[in-house]
Amino acid sequence: MDKLKVGLISLGCDKNRVDSEIILGNVKSAYEIVTDPKLADFIIINTCGFIESAKQESIDTILEMSQYKGKYNCRGIVVTGCLAQRYGIELMELLPEIDIMLGVNDYDKLVENINNFISDKQNKIHNCGYSDLNINEGKRILTTKSHTAYLRIAEGCDNYCTYCIIPKIRGKYRSRSIENILQECNELSLRGVKEVILIAQDTTRYGIDLYNKKMLPELMRSISKIEGIEWIRLLYCYPEEITEDIIDEIALNDKVCNYIDIPLQHISDNILKLMGRRGRKKDILRNINELRKKINDISIRTTIIVGFPGESEEDFKELKNFIENIKFDNLGVFKYSREEGTRAYKMKDQVSEELKTAREGELMMLQKHIIYSMQKYKIGNKYKVLVEGKKEGVWYGRNYAMAPDIDGVIYIKSKKELKVGTMIDVKITNSVEYDLVGVVYDESGK
């Protein structure tokens, strides 16, 4: 008898991507995994429920895939992830197209639930009770390029920012043990992974719950000893938790990329206080200055929220001036999303959607000009580049300052075939918006 075919659609952030990889790892022994949902008996949709646009994308995807029932092979729609965890049975009542629903803690029950649905001919299965997630990631099926993997070092969050629903969805902050992480790292290395990207809701607090102290520097040091791992990249670093020890480890450890992602959200002390952020402008400036003093080629990425309740014209001007002066290497701007269940939802002085959009556009245009002015100084530089593949016949890759999917790439001119997943030296010859253009160094004539 042929195995059931299962397809998966993953929405949302890279932390959700890791969940999707765990789901695929859990079902691979029981079912055949297909990439085309038209061929799937069951379609799993791993949803995001963080902000309004993400919720709408999840709902639209559920409705679109539900049309495959009767039209193609689909016998059932399975909904997992943050949207399922956030709304539970309410979501199932709203969308009767859903047959099976699992929260963020129940991925190990997926095969059992699908089998029960088939054998018992049950109409619905709902399984979204809360319990601490088993943070042993298990045997994932990587959905990234074979040489790069996201490595989740902790789950949950204790920060409780006033705009954020994640602690209610994902629970308290829980670190994985160093031993568990290193075991997975060794396995990833044996599979050909060269770049591990450390992620969590807050990577800088790693270890505080397990070891009663923050252990991120020790973790990075341990990972760097694993043969085959060449790049360690840090995302989601809470600004006030960036200690001198973390900065020193980035500066001194050759395998840790001189790159850091710090979601600042704002710079006005007034807005930071309303957001429930612990640090203030002086703390942020101190840490940025310390990073740049100790690591002269550090690449700093950040994300900003505009239109938070109470954001005045003065607050926005302060934010704009800050971005203009600091000149981040990469920056993302998001419009504040008013989410039920958060403290900010009930705040006065909500900003109009029109003004949010205008402020978002203004900051993105500013960042575009900043990038243009910074890129020209990279022409003539030589970088170690991780070869990623080809786009329209042109090789491309990334250097230490480029995280996958969210930052730019380097297009590589080469007279010979390159091997995906290898590191090569590239001399930069030009820039195109957020991307760079270069030539293989030994072909550049120096």
From Swiss-Prot:
<dbReference type="InterPro" id="IPR002792">
    <property type="entry name" value="TRAM_dom"/>
</dbReference>
<dbReference type="InterPro" id="IPR012340">
    <property type="entry name" value="NA-bd_OB-fold"/>
</dbReference>
<feature type="binding site">
    <location>
        <position position="157"/>
    </location>
    <ligand>
        <name>[4Fe-4S] cluster 2</name>
    </ligand>
</feature>
<dbReference type="InterPro" id="IPR023404">
    <property type="entry name" value="rSAM_horseshoe"/>
</dbReference>
<dbReference type="Pfam" id="PF00919">
    <property type="entry name" value="UPF0004"/>
</dbReference>
<dbReference type="InterPro" id="IPR038135">
    <property type="entry name" value="Methylthiotransferase_N_sf"/>
</dbReference>
<dbReference type="GO" id="GO:0051539">
    <property type="term" value="F:4 iron, 4 sulfur cluster binding"/>
</dbReference>
<dbReference type="GO" id="GO:0103039">
    <property type="term" value="F:protein methylthiotransferase activity"/>
</dbReference>
<dbReference type="GO" id="GO:0046872">
    <property type="term" value="F:metal ion binding"/>
</dbReference>
<dbReference type="GO" id="GO:0006400">
    <property type="term" value="P:tRNA modification"/>
</dbReference>
<dbReference type="InterPro" id="IPR020612">
    <property type="entry name" value="Methylthiotransferase_CS"/>
</dbReference>
<feature type="binding site">
    <location>
        <position position="161"/>
    </location>
    <ligand>
        <name>[4Fe-4S] cluster 2</name>
    </ligand>
</feature>
<keyword id="KW-0808">Transferase</keyword>
<keyword id="KW-0479">Metal-binding</keyword>
<feature type="binding site">
    <location>
        <position position="82"/>
    </location>
    <ligand>
        <name>[4Fe-4S] cluster 1</name>
    </ligand>
</feature>
<feature type="binding site">
    <location>
        <position position="13"/>
    </location>
    <ligand>
        <name>[4Fe-4S] cluster 1</name>
    </ligand>
</feature>
<dbReference type="InterPro" id="IPR006638">
    <property type="entry name" value="Elp3/MiaA/NifB-like_rSAM"/>
</dbReference>
<dbReference type="InterPro" id="IPR007197">
    <property type="entry name" value="rSAM"/>
</dbReference>
<protein>
    <recommendedName>
        <fullName>Ribosomal protein uS12 methylthiotransferase RimO</fullName>
        <ecNumber>2.8.4.4</ecNumber>
    </recommendedName>
</protein>
<dbReference type="GO" id="GO:0005829">
    <property type="term" value="C:cytosol"/>
</dbReference>
<feature type="binding site">
    <location>
        <position position="164"/>
    </location>
    <ligand>
        <name>[4Fe-4S] cluster 2</name>
    </ligand>
</feature>
<keyword id="KW-0949">S-adenosyl-L-methionine</keyword>
<dbReference type="InterPro" id="IPR005840">
    <property type="entry name" value="Ribosomal_uS12_MeSTrfase_RimO"/>
</dbReference>
<feature type="domain" description="TRAM">
    <location>
        <begin position="376"/>
        <end position="442"/>
    </location>
</feature>
<comment type="similarity">
    <text>Belongs to the methylthiotransferase family. RimO subfamily.</text>
</comment>
<keyword id="KW-0411">Iron-sulfur</keyword>
<dbReference type="GO" id="GO:0035599">
    <property type="term" value="F:aspartic acid methylthiotransferase activity"/>
</dbReference>
<feature type="domain" description="Radical SAM core">
    <location>
        <begin position="143"/>
        <end position="373"/>
    </location>
</feature>
<feature type="domain" description="MTTase N-terminal">
    <location>
        <begin position="4"/>
        <end position="119"/>
    </location>
</feature>
<keyword id="KW-0963">Cytoplasm</keyword>
<dbReference type="Pfam" id="PF04055">
    <property type="entry name" value="Radical_SAM"/>
</dbReference>
<comment type="function">
    <text>Catalyzes the methylthiolation of an aspartic acid residue of ribosomal protein uS12.</text>
</comment>
<dbReference type="InterPro" id="IPR013848">
    <property type="entry name" value="Methylthiotransferase_N"/>
</dbReference>
<keyword id="KW-0408">Iron</keyword>
<dbReference type="Pfam" id="PF18693">
    <property type="entry name" value="TRAM_2"/>
</dbReference>
<dbReference type="InterPro" id="IPR005839">
    <property type="entry name" value="Methylthiotransferase"/>
</dbReference>
<keyword id="KW-0004">4Fe-4S</keyword>
<feature type="binding site">
    <location>
        <position position="48"/>
    </location>
    <ligand>
        <name>[4Fe-4S] cluster 1</name>
    </ligand>
</feature>
